[in-house]
């Protein structure tokens, strides 16, 4: 099987982002057709795998903040979700919110979350996540 994998990888190439193949169809990875026009896409299992992998990465990023371990599960979920949605570089721009979280001032952290471009862009998601940060409860 490893020889087969090696051969297919060599023939197809490996591309870590979506691209158009030689016939103009959206493809990713090792020749994986994702173009909807031809029935391409991902299975539910593949979607779940990708999500779990992304959450694992965001969890590891969240654990780099000294204050993260002291948060309860709903507040940790808010931070992980923000990292998932924004990416770490953009989440690191939430300095006032992060400082408030570190100080245990969750009301201010929630206010700072809502006072952002992100909140204007995502609407109800921001309201829900700010409420979770404020209360420490699942919503």
Identify the meaning behind each predicted range.
Residues 57-83, 87-91:
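Active-site nucleophile-His-acid catalytic modules used for acyl/amide transfer and hydrolysis
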Residues 1-17, 23, 32-37, 42-55, ...:
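Long, amphipathic alpha-helical surface segments
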